[in-house]
Amino acid sequence: MELENDTRIPEFLLLGFSEEPKLQPFLFGLFLSMYLVTILGNLLLILAVSSDSHLHTPMYFFLANLSFVDICFTCTTIPKMLVNIQTQRKVITYESCIIQMYFFELFAGIDNFLLTVMAYDRYMAICYPLHYMVIMNPQLCSLLLLVSWIMSALHSLLQTLMVLRLSFCTHFQIPHFFCELNQMIQLACSDTFLNNMMLYFAAILLGVAPLVGVLYSYFKIVSSIRGISSAHSKYKAFSTCASHLSVVSLFYCTSLGVYLSSAAPQSTHTSSVASVMYTVVTPMLNPFIYSLRNKDIKGALNVFFRGKP
């Protein structure tokens, strides 16, 4: 029993992006700026939706929740990385690493489910406009949100418990800027067959399945839009989906890039850089993508800050 306990290490080293001292101030300033923009942008979007009663609709309900999750998602990794860069201390305890991994998987999963639910919401709004508010009632919206949280929490808990059974013998260095699940599994010196099988199963169930749902929803949406005779109505229908489609494409393309880069040999640096895209860049861009051409969001913020439409 004592031998087994000795294989449990007290801490890991997060190697980050670069050990070059001259690059540390640049990296700190870059990620601090992106972090602050992410928090501010998503908070403003939540503020706009909550302050304007006209935006209390299913679409904006899910959008506000997506912004909240994006804030939490970013807060699981960036603050620790900023502290490590500033203090030049890359140590993270075993317990902190497990906690960070759990919440990262939790919020990444909720992000994924919410994007799928939002695609379903747009499908209902465009394909069944007369019954939209009846179908997408507050009870169903709350239920879809609750199911997203529960499924993601269960998945995150299961993956975390699977990591807790692993032993780490000699390799204490994580070639990443946070405790990423796949990196943790690769560092283990015990048998990881079950962990890898669970990882692939989760990728199919929680990655491919929601993506198929999104693609199916947009296939039906495009088919429905093509049947609209009015050019103005076509443009309006398409514009309501363009923002969400941009966010979905950004999220899934960058996630796929991380998955492919982590599967390739000798690609830890590439995987870290690719991870920045969906852990930092995507949450930062989401509020701007949704509000750039959205007159309702800009109008709500204008009323809130200036007191007039």
Curated annotation (Swiss-Prot):
Pfam hit, one: 7tm_4
Membrane topology (UniProt): Multi-pass membrane protein
Recorded GO MF terms: G protein-coupled receptor activity; olfactory receptor activity
Main location group: membrane
Any GO BP annotation: signal transduction
Residues in compartment: Extracellular: 1-25, 80-100, 159-196, 261-272
Location(s), subcellular: Cell membrane
Coiled-coil stretches: none
Keywords on record: Cell membrane, G-protein coupled receptor, Glycoprotein, Membrane, Olfaction, Receptor, Sensory transduction, Transducer, Transmembrane, Transmembrane helix
Cytoplasmic side: 50-57, 121-139, 220-236, 293-309
Function: Putative odorant or sperm cell receptor.
The protein's name: Olfactory receptor-like protein OLF4
Organism expressing this protein natively: Canis lupus familiaris (Dog)
Organism ancestry: Eukaryota, Metazoa, Chordata, Craniata, Vertebrata
